[in-house]
Amino acid sequence: MPKWLDKALGIEKSSIEETRNMENYKMHLREIDTNVVNNEPYSMESIEKGMNGKTTAYMQPIIGEMSVNPGYKTKPSIRNSQDLHKTLKKFGNNIILNAIINTRSNQVSMYCKPARNSETGVGYEIRLKDIEAEPTSHDIANIKRIESFLENTAQFRDPNRDNFTTFCKKLVRATYMYDQVNFEKVFDKDGNFIKFDTVDPTTIFLATNGEGKLIKNGERFVQVIDNRIVAKFNERELAFAVRNPRADIEVGQYGYPELEIALKQFIAHENTEVFNDRFFSHGGTTRGILHVKTGQQQSQQALDIFRREWRSSLAGINGSWQIPVVSAEDVKFVNMTPSANDMQFEKWLNYLINVISALYGIDPAEINFPNNGGATGSKGGSLNEGNSKEKMQASQNKGLQPLLRFIEDTVNTYIVAEFGEKYQFQFRGGDLSAQLDKLKIIEQEGKVFRTVNEIRHDKGLEPIKGGDVILNGVHIQAIGQALQEEQLEYQRSQDRLNRLLELSGGDVEQPEPEEPKDSQNDTDVSFQDEQQGLNGKSKKVNGKVDDNVGKDGQLKSEENTNSTKHGTDGIKKE
């Protein structure tokens, strides 16, 4: 069958299916309760409470989505636009928006490498959800496998594929422009998760059934190109994450992007730049009416020639500040341009930039538009203003940290969960000042209600001797005073005892010393033997242990220096 015929038949089948869906939709409308259509209240008997484990509140409109493209729900349009994505994409090239996106993308990219491979400790890590649990060798192997999977965005390494840094940069742009992040998860024939690829969020929509209601189970998402559904996905096959969710019943699960919220300000910024640009591109003349009063000698032909010369020579950049020459009785110019000086122009632009930056949670100074305070950036020198470093850190805490948390939740929900429920993805490191602030908080806690050993226990360290105390000078001083009072009390008791001894003349009975335990060896010298010498029949006279030892301390049965004769004592006399 020729390709053109196959394509034509495919279009015809699609049209038939759309027609059938529309007929089912109309039939459903006819079957809607007349109480709803006529806006009549329900009777109390027909109202059921959510006591059976089911939600009774409506999460979708009672009348389903009526769209020219049945099968999916589009985003609510603004300014009568049929496709909100196209409107957002049109203003997605705004210079302020791209400055914000590029700044945040570059900041996020600093966290897209494993922290254990970074010298600064900045990056991401895969760890156990249970902080107190010790990872086994199997857990460590799985953690390394997940890190490798994230780095390559697949089980295998392919230089033509996006790495995790590129994936996160695409994610930041998608969420800042459309507040919708989509990527497809690919599985092999055995159901194993092998890779994930980013998908254009402007082509992904929520699927609807024949009644125009959102599908809760099964193929909940569709991809639409040229107003035709080209692919369908279930919850496991496609990730659908939003950063600014809404409970609006007309919106469904679509997010609320900052670009849509500040669309009026973005349009005003574009118009302001165009207005200022035309001042240079269309010459330096202002808008107004040139009134030429011709004399009797002037003809209409000469006036037409002057008009053509004006338009040709004074228009464009090369015609700026040119002086026209005309011969007439009188020439007047009526200025129709409102007076707007450079200061007003600057304040208006500063206001737009500050409002847009505030909506994205970023300090204008991060995109090289320093703000001296106030909506127009004209105030400064306030005592409440911090230095530039503190303002930068506050800006990142307000905008960058929530963005990193959104990426963490997305990766954990749609990627890491495929490897088990016991693992968790999180970013680590960051600005050193933030870490110093955490240490200061711990230090203050250690001075009020936490002991040193409690802090060490939270950090996974062993307790130390003397660490069961808070690091508070007042508390330590109180402990020292208590010890000092104990010492004084002991000194007083000793003084009282000494005075009693003096008054009694030394007759106060002293506590008898402890008698040593009976010796089990007869050769041991007892305390009494040492003190009294045991004069008499005892073999241990003078405390000797062995009778074979002489008074000089030498053995009697052995030759020694005292038993050997010296000098002439050993020579026999003849």
Curated annotation (Swiss-Prot):
The keyword Coiled coil does not apply. InterPro entries: Phage/GTA_portal (IPR006944). Residues 522-535 have a biased composition (Polar residues). Residues 543-559 have a biased composition (Basic and acidic residues). One of its GO terms (cellular component) is viral capsid. Pfam families: Phage_portal. The keyword Iron does not apply. Residues 504-574 are annotated as: Disordered. Keywords: Capsid protein, DNA-binding, Viral capsid assembly, Viral contractile tail ejection system, Viral genome ejection through host cell envelope, Viral genome packaging, Viral penetration into host cytoplasm, Viral release from host cell, Virion, Virus entry into host cell. It is found in: Virion. One of its GO terms (biological process) is symbiont genome ejection through host cell envelope, contractile tail mechanism. GO terms for molecular function: DNA binding. Forms the portal vertex of the capsid. This portal plays critical roles in head assembly, genome packaging, neck/tail attachment, and genome ejection. The portal protein multimerizes as a single ring-shaped homododecamer arranged around a central channel. Binds to the terminase subunits to form the packaging machine. Belongs to the phage portal family. Homododecamer. This is Probable portal protein. It comes from Enterococcus phage phiEF24C (Enterococcus bacteriophage phi-EF24C). The lineage of its organism: Viruses, Duplodnaviria, Heunggongvirae, Uroviricota, Caudoviricetes.
